Amino acid sequence: MDFKDYYKILGVEPTADDKAIKAAYRKLARKYHPDVSKERDAEDKFKEANEAYEVLGDAQKRAEFDEIRKYGGQHGRPFQAPPGWENRGGGGGFEGGDFSDFFSSIFGGRGGGNPFGGARQQQRSAGRRGQDVELELAVFLEETLSKESKQISFQVPQTNAMGQRTGFTTKTLNVKIPAGVTDGERIRLKGQGAPGSGGGANGDLFLTLRMAPHPLFDVEGHDLIITVPLAPWEAALGAKVAVPTLEGKINLTIRPDSQSGQRLRVPGKGLANKQGERGNLYAQLKVVMPTTSDESTRELWAKLSEKAAFNPRAQWSK
């Protein structure tokens, strides 16, 4: 198993703050998103960036990674977790997601470090009722529209008839993400926490949902915003552009003489509310200049500047 230095993967320093880490992740996610990138290894790099952000974007997992990084792990070199590392601490681990063996060896199946948030148990003083379990669960935008369940695994404490803790066991559930969920929303799964002792009732499972940042979409309420890059001639002459949505690409008509910053509304392609009604997708146009140009291209721009009676700063003279 090779060591993964998540700082190197995102291209940030170990001293980077949360804002810099998020910005680096979004840059890589946009670059290697399967709907955007044509590079052969784009999918692998996209998954690698997601994994790095799952760790560095969470304060608790980042602290654990920083600690294990001190053991001398070097990116891409063989590595083995220190003895006893996976048995440290109690609480809920998460098994699932498309993550590497390295990630699973460090964070899988134990509390305080898992792809979708730390976990903690709240001890109830009442009788022999089982403990409640609290987890943070990352939810991707696509999952809010999916009819499929999301599988989660976590650890729950085991007790004997006297209520004394004897160890931990892993519990796996299939959870349906409700329509219209928002970041920070807390849902309760009754009786899905730790088992009771001496005939006592099971504890409950509380999930705090955290909306994971998307590489393409920003969220405004139940609306989605996507930036659509356009070549200058596409904005001037009009075009048909394939635009990603959460459910696949659609063809968007760009009218002639479109402006950078203009928003086009696509009804019903946003997120769902509690009633299942969909918000809108707003395509925000952004005119992008070519990064390089040859002599013939510059000649065309020069001819255009001579013929086009256009002053973009005309309002300054008023």
UniProtKB/Swiss-Prot annotation:
Per UniProt, what is one Pfam family of this protein? DnaJ
Supply the alphabetized keyword list: Chaperone, Cytoplasm, DNA-binding
Give the InterPro entries listed for this entry.
DNA-bd_curved-DNA (IPR023859), DnaJ_C (IPR002939), DnaJ_domain (IPR001623), DnaJ_domain_CS (IPR018253), HSP40/DnaJ_pept-bd (IPR008971), J_dom_sf (IPR036869)
What is the designated name of this protein?
A: Curved DNA-binding protein
Q: Does this UniProt record's set of keywords contain DNA-binding?
A: yes
Q: What does this protein do?
A: DNA-binding protein that preferentially recognizes a curved DNA sequence. It is probably a functional analog of DnaJ; displays overlapping activities with DnaJ, but functions under different conditions, probably acting as a molecular chaperone in an adaptive response to environmental stresses other than heat shock. Lacks autonomous chaperone activity; binds native substrates and targets them for recognition by DnaK. Its activity is inhibited by the binding of CbpM.
Higher taxonomy: Bacteria, Pseudomonadati, Pseudomonadota, Gammaproteobacteria, Pseudomonadales
Q: Name one GO molecular function term.
A: unfolded protein binding
Which segments carry the region annotation Disordered?
111-130
| Disulfide topology | none
Q: GO biological process annotations for this chain's record?
A: chaperone cofactor-dependent protein refolding; protein refolding
Where is it localised?
Cytoplasm, Nucleoid
Query: What superkingdom heads the lineage?
Result: Bacteria
